[in-house]
Amino acid sequence: MVLDPKEKMPDDGASGDHGDSASLGAINPAYSNSSLPHSTGDSEEPFTTYFDEKIPIPEEEYSCFSFRKLWAFTGPGFLMSIAYLDPGNIESDLQSGAVAGFKLLWVLLLATIVGLLLQRLAARLGVVTGLHLAEVCHRQYPKVPRIILWLMVELAIIGSDMQEVIGSAIAINLLSAGRVPLWGGVLITIADTFVFLFLDKYGLRKLEAFFGFLITIMALTFGYEYITVKPSQSQVLRGMFVPSCPGCRTPQVEQAVGIVGAVIMPHNMYLHSALVKSRQVNRANKQEVREANKYFFIESCIALFVSFIINVFVVSVFAEAFFEKTNKQVVEVCKNNSSPHADLFPSDNSTLAVDIYKGGVVLGCYFGPAALYIWAVGILAAGQSSTMTGTYSGQFVMEGFLNLKWSRFARVILTRSIAIIPTLLVAVFQDVEHLTGMNDFLNVLQSLQLPFALIPILTFTSLRPVMSEFSNGIGWRIAGGILVLIVCSINMYFVVVYVQELGHVALYVVAAVVSVAYLTFVFYLGWQCLIALGLSFLDCGRSYRLGLTAQPELYLLNTVDADSVVSR
């Protein structure tokens, strides 16, 4: 229903299990279907995913900080941080080190900080409203824009899933010394993902502990490579804290843009806003909401600090060992060490170009087989952890946008099939060069989808009717708007550079047509965002107002269990 600001609102006691129906207003009359479905009584079983249990928060009076409470809130941030460690990020890291040395570490640091600030907004939306970003989008946008937005986010998730499958398949191929072909690795990844996804049947904390275990494996394996290579610590610190890039040309600039595109993942905003709902927070109590926001932010800081250090390990290893190395130098070292992969590189004086597969091979040539196998274990952990969180993202997005009751098994079958089929075809009919080359295209795809997460999250967290006193202040609105504009511009530059490299007129025409449609939709979302940021004159004199509710006191949705997600 559409909320009339003049209507008398039901009080807390009368709102019932679906009291948020009144609080979910609309931008315009097209939003008349935005309320939650009415209760059908006890005959309908609750349907949940990830939220079968909620972690209780210990009560401690007169404490501004408690490690017990921090531990209770720990989990969602580390699951979110997996997206900063997926195979796409690892490939971006090693290419950054090989192309620019230590010079772009400050870009990685800046991108991680920007990502942290955006994740803060996503977590706050979930905590304050009790709804994750996809659910809010379902209730706010009209049907056609909502479906387009859902398709764009699904495309980003599928693209990310393909990167994760590629990374896992390459890792399995390296670990088996080539005995398991790439297509075999793809099939193995399908099977083990189903096994891992049902770990939460044994409890939410055990699932979060398993993700923590995978992050620990990445830290140990990539940390081992870091210790083995022994990069210059002064160079690492200089590259991290001195924002400059002397002697950088187009390849280095493109790599810097690629770092931003790889680090800030669109589906991660949807994921994090849903994960925070796994903690017991009484949204009727502003102090509890404020406390939850604080601890979730602290946890996110810790989690992204860990992911940043792991990324620094990878960049530094390839910066120290392989920056400005030529193919001929690598071939000689590989032959001297009797490596079976010496013929992987052309024997010329062109600069070494590396990817996840070649990176492991080169490490094996220079530092022994142990370095290769440990690298592969780290890549496998990155691929497995990120493919699991990607599946959760897909489930939350589908449930939120479509209000669709789908089992996780069916959801995984669908998205995995879409992601696996093209990856499997390339693995069967092409070689590892083409498989790893898909990562470049997929990074561009992720960059294109970024506005479809950043603009909605900034829009809804800036609305006082949605967030009440927890809405973004004027400083956050201005900074957030500038931030979104810069990030989207950087990523569009990345896309333009990629399209120019295609070198075919027909592809230019297709790209131009798609760009017009793409920019039109981004403009629509941006227009709605600017209205939310306070530029009300842009509403063209329409009578509706943007927001979930016309009465801010209902923002907490404190009488509704908004965790309406599907059963397995």
Curated annotation (Swiss-Prot):
Region (Disordered): 1-45
Extracellular side: 91-95, 176-179, 230-255, 323-360, 430-440, 504-506
Transmembrane segments: 70-90, 96-117, 155-175, 180-194, 209-229, 256-276, 302-322, 361-381, 409-429, 441-461, 483-503, 507-527
Record membrane topology: Multi-pass membrane protein
Cellular component aspect of the GO annotation: apical plasma membrane; basal part of cell; brush border; brush border membrane; cell surface; early endosome; early endosome membrane; endomembrane system
Effect of G185R: In microcytic anemia
Residue span of region Required for early endosome targeting: 555-559
Keywords per UniProt: Cell membrane, Disease variant, Endosome, Glycoprotein, Golgi apparatus, Ion transport, Iron, Iron transport, Lysosome, Membrane, Mitochondrion, Mitochondrion outer membrane, Phosphoprotein, Symport, Transmembrane, Transmembrane helix, Transport, Ubl conjugation
Source domain of life: Eukaryota
Tagged with keyword Ligase: no
GO biological process terms on file: cadmium ion transmembrane transport; cobalt ion transport; dendrite morphogenesis; erythrocyte development; establishment of localization in cell; heme biosynthetic process; iron import into cell; iron ion transport
Residue ranges with Basic and acidic residues bias: 1-20
Parts of the chain on the Cytoplasmic side: 1-69, 118-154, 195-208, 277-301, 382-408, 462-482, 528-568
Modification note: Ubiquitinated by WWP2. N-glycosylated.
Compartments reported by the entry: Apical cell membrane; Mitochondrion outer membrane; Extracellular vesicle membrane
Disruption phenotype: Mice display no apparent anatomical abnormalities. They are however anemic, show progressive postnatal growth retardation, and at birth have elevated liver iron stores compared with wild-type littermates. None survive for more than 7 days. Heterozygotes appear normal, showing no significant hematological abnormalities. However, by 8 weeks, their liver iron content is lower than in wild-type littermates.
Family affiliation: Belongs to the NRAMP family.
Subunit structure and binding partners: Forms a complex with NDFIP1 and NEDD4L, in cortical neurons, in response to iron and cobalt exposure; this interaction leads to SLC11A2 ubiquitination by NEDD4L and proteasome-dependent degradation. Interacts with NDFIP1, NDFIP2 and WWP2; this interaction leads to SLC11A2 ubiquitination by WWP2 and subsequent proteasome-dependent degradation. Interacts with COX2 and TOM6 at the outer mitochondrion membrane. Interacts with ARRDC1; this interaction regulates the incorporation of SLC11A2 into extracellular vesicles through an ubiquitination-dependent mechanism.
Disease entry from the Swiss-Prot or TrEMBL record: Defects in Slc11a2 are the cause of microcytic anemia (mk). Homozygous mk/mk mice have hypochromic microcytic anemia due to severe defects in intestinal iron absorption and erythroid iron utilization.
Note: Nifedipine induces duodenal iron accumulation and mobilizes iron from the liver of iron-overloaded mice.
The name this protein goes by in its record: Natural resistance-associated macrophage protein 2
